[in-house]
Amino acid sequence: MNKKGFTLIEVLVSLVILAIIAVISSNILKSSLETERITSEQLESIKELSLASSIIRRDVRQLVNVNSRDFYGNNENGTLISEINTQNLIFNTSIKSISDQISPIKRVEYILDGNNFIKKQFFSSNPFSPDDYTKIELIKNVSNLTISFLHKDTWHQSWPINLETSKKIPVLIKIEFFKDNKNYSWILDPNITHALQN
């Protein structure tokens, strides 16, 4: 008897083979999607760090060694300020303005706000209101931020360190932090060797 068609065993074997192919394909797809997600997160982190590094390096490179005043008009104790254990850095920098009628010198403050490293840019070098600034979130999920200053071959945790250094800019600025289970260390060179003359 010659019947045309498939036997039950042939159909079952075909279904088992198709099921194995489907499981392998879904595992490959799941693995590919996970790899793509991890790669995208790492790329976003690299872009975030690169942009933050560019912004702070530009501001430090264009740092202006001029007297600063607090929000009450009193002279600050330095031209670049970072008090110990505050995780912030305050200085004046030259930032291009849309209008030539506005001074390009603006006060900037880099600070750890919660777990985010942010930049506050004030509208002038000596602002009269502590609330008149724009805020840029540079790096998210930062911990263990430390800022150090090189002076006479020694790293210091605050600036200025004395009356003599209050009119100077440190030779180097080091910013260290921890993000995504990695330690980062940036060394910034202000390249300003002269002291402020009054």
How does the language model describe each region?
Residues N141-N198:
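Short linear sequence signals and composition-biased patches located at protein termini or domain-edge surfaces
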Residues N27, L33-F128:
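Extracytoplasmic beta-strand-rich oligomerization domains located immediately C-terminal to a leader/signal peptide
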Residues K4, K135-L138, K168:
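Extracytoplasmic/secreted proteins and extracellular or luminal domains
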Residues K96-S97, D113-G114, Y133-I139, L145-I147:
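Periplasmic/extracellular, small/polar-rich flexible segments of pilin-like filament-forming proteins
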